[in-house]
Amino acid sequence: MPSFDTVCEANLVDVRNAVENTAKEIATRFDFKGTAASITIQEREITLIGDADFQLTQIEDVLRNKLTKRSVDVRFLDIGEVRKIGGDKVKQLLKVRSGIESELARKIQKLLKDSKLKVQGAIQEDKVRVTGAKRDDLQAAMALIRKEVTDVPLSFDNFRD
């Protein structure tokens, strides 16, 4: 029986490269000379540090540019609030999303059930496996999911015939 997996997974290698390129640009830009502006990544957490809020927004804009150039959707980033740290500096945490949340998985499953397509959706940890009798039904299900779920960057992999 043909099937595919619906996942929400960023390419962490490209994310890391984008963060490193952002750090290089911050080090060479004139408006960041002599400031505490920096960006680091540890696993799925990106840390921005700057002297003021506007510096954080500038660093975030540079990061968004670098991510876009590497074809990484910026909707993978969960942006945290700006916090003050010692010495008149501010810090912001960005988390890289991984996996489909259970609420969204249930929404996708209900969407498939209500669509009258001959497919079934099964929630498996952080992904949704869609199975159907025909390949055409699966392709219609992919199109339906792409059309209806726009707030999270979803991709389809593990297509089996």
Swiss-Prot record:
One of its GO terms (cellular component) is cytosol. Belongs to the YajQ family. It comes from Verminephrobacter eiseniae (strain EF01-2). InterPro entries: DUF520, UPF0234-like_C, UPF0234_N, YajQ-like_sf. The keyword Phosphoprotein does not apply. Nucleotide-binding protein. This is Nucleotide-binding protein Veis_3464. It comes from the Bacteria. Keywords: Nucleotide-binding. It holds the Pfam family DUF520. The keyword Aminoacyl-tRNA synthetase does not apply. PANTHER family: UPF0234 PROTEIN YAJQ. One of its GO terms (molecular function) is nucleotide binding.
